[in-house]
Amino acid sequence: MKMANRPSHGDGGDIEKACMQRDGNICVVTQVYDVHQPAPDDKSMLTSYLAAVHILPFLEEERSASSGVWFNVRRYFPSMRSELDDHHQVDGLYHNPRNVITLMDPLYRDFGDFRVSLEPTSNNNASHVYRLRTHRNFSTCLVPFLPENGLVTLTNHNNEKDECPLPSPVLLETHAAIAQILDATDGSTDIRRLLSVKFLRRR
């Protein structure tokens, strides 16, 4: 089952560019710089291919707020209710900067597969500091690039910060919760089954 994790250039190219600029054209976890940008002043800075990716990798058919998956997301992840209500419909949240984060390749692949996650360090997380968690089948070749203290701070590099807000702590918290559940299932459960009523009632 294919996840639509990276915004396509057809309908998400503008938001992809805006979010990468918001994140300073660096991977927010590794601080690796975008190889497509002009050479950084700091010549010691590593470069790689970056992508602005969805925090919650929606399937195209699940982008309707009436879908069973979204009914269960609202029910079993209460904090998501306000996030969905604020954007009125799932599609409004899908192409929203709050649902997009900049990561390097191949880290964004692990993020999309829920093999790495960012947990808020406080209830309101106004400081946007997150604890990095790795999960089952994480690509261990990436370990040298991860922050030694296990913390990731998100910073908005835009002058007009309201135009492109930072990723939502609620969405990152939900992503982390799903990653933990998938980790506990030994990788034997896919996201569709995870978000089914029958499965969630057993958790």
Residue ranges with predicted function:
Residues M1-H36:
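A structural/positional concept
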Residues M1-N5, P38-P40, R75-S79:
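Short, charged, low-hydrophobicity "junction" segments
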Residues K17-A18, P40-D41, D91-G92:
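Beta-strand elements of modular eukaryotic interaction domains
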Residues I26-E60:
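Conserved, ordered domain cores of eukaryotic regulatory proteins
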Residues M45, Y49, L56-R203:
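A detector for short metal-coordination/catalytic motifs
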